[in-house]
Amino acid sequence: MLESPWHPLLSQPATEAAIALLGCWLVRRFADGRVIRGRIVETEAYEAGDPACHGYRRQTARNRSMFGPPGQVYVYQIYGRYHCINLATEAADLASAVLIRALEFPDTEAIAGAGPGRLCRFLAIDRQLDGSWLGPTSPLDLEAADYPLGTLIQTTRIGLTRGVDLPWRWYLAESPAVSRRDRRAEAEQMGVSV
């Protein structure tokens, strides 16, 4: 079985890995030699036992990669047109993953990576990459954070009908690429009045 070099970081529960991934760079390598890097600025966690988790009820052909060992890529499609990239976490055979919600791309408008559908479109990530591995010879990899993160905001996830009250979304307050800000959480966590 393959193992991602990022296995140690991703062997944590999704709620811990989601925080640890902030500031890291998601690297996309293309067959023509191009490489695009985006700094991870927003994540959401999904764990076994969470009613919003795709693997909450059972493993299926569609969500199989979510049950993969830490570092396996889980890509799914929503609304029949947008793709979302997740990284399997914690342990094999356990439904646990981190959704990459937003990336900040150097020298590119913030809107390009503001949301899972946009960042996947910008990086040409689709179901063909589902089940792949993070690593130096893979189309997808991570690089360590290389500068201070700034202010970390914790709040609830977006667009759910179940598990809506779980505060399992994190983002870097200073990033212009955050998909949706929670001004109340920012005020509370940064000590500023609304």
Curated annotation (Swiss-Prot):
Keyword DNA damage set for record: yes
Enzyme class: hydrolase
SUPFAM superfamilies cross-referenced by the UniProt entry: FMT C-terminal domain-like
InterPro entries (UniProt xref): Formyl_transferase-like_C_sf, MPG, MPG_sf
GO molecular function: alkylbase DNA N-glycosylase activity; DNA binding
EC code: 3.2.2.-
GO biological process: one example: base-excision repair
UniProt entry tagged with the keyword Hydrolase: yes
UniProt entry keywords in alphabetical sequence: DNA damage, DNA repair, Hydrolase
Stored NCBIfam families: 3mg
Homology family: Belongs to the DNA glycosylase MPG family.
The protein's name: Putative 3-methyladenine DNA glycosylase
